[in-house]
Amino acid sequence: MVDESTRKTLSSIPLLQTKAGPRDKELWVQRLKEEYQALIKYVQNNKSSDSDWFRLESNKEGTKWFGKCWYVHNLLKYEFDVEFDIPVTYPATAPEIALPELDGKTAKMYRGGKICLTDHFKPLWSRNVPKFGIAHAMALGLAPWLAVEIPDLIEKGVVAYKEKGETSS
């Protein structure tokens, strides 16, 4: 079900221990610490393998996440805003990652630009609660979605390359 490259990526992301969501005050602080450690490790791994593709930050409470992700196609870098909220039932419920500027541009997306992850990602996530976290959602959810959808959207002319400083169309 998971290819060798994905398996290698996954095995290099630390698994999380604490089963806590935003409602579990003290435990949530511990979970956030684990989330950041896993994200830092994942970004370091990506940089060392020359496959750096996103930046994320969160609000103070760690319940709203936002940043940028990018996809390189034919040597052009396509950059998108990425955002998601941590569900109150997290980690039992995976975050719904959104790329707002692509809202309505592909069938594999829900209202608000939330990417469709139901078929492949959600069952894998539910089997791995609480071990999977935000880094895993990026690696198993957003990364493959970008790899499939962005080249298709570029081919169809739905997504166009923007020079630095240009605004979205």
UniProtKB/Swiss-Prot annotation:
GO terms for molecular function: UFM1 conjugating enzyme activity. The lineage of its organism: Eukaryota, Metazoa, Ecdysozoa, Arthropoda, Hexapoda. CDD domains: UBCc_UFC1. GO terms for biological process: protein K69-linked ufmylation. The keyword DNA-binding does not apply. This is Ubiquitin-fold modifier-conjugating enzyme 1. It holds the Pfam family UFC1. E2-like enzyme which forms an intermediate with UFM1 via a thioester linkage. The active site is at 116 (glycyl thioester intermediate). GO terms for cellular component: cytoplasm.
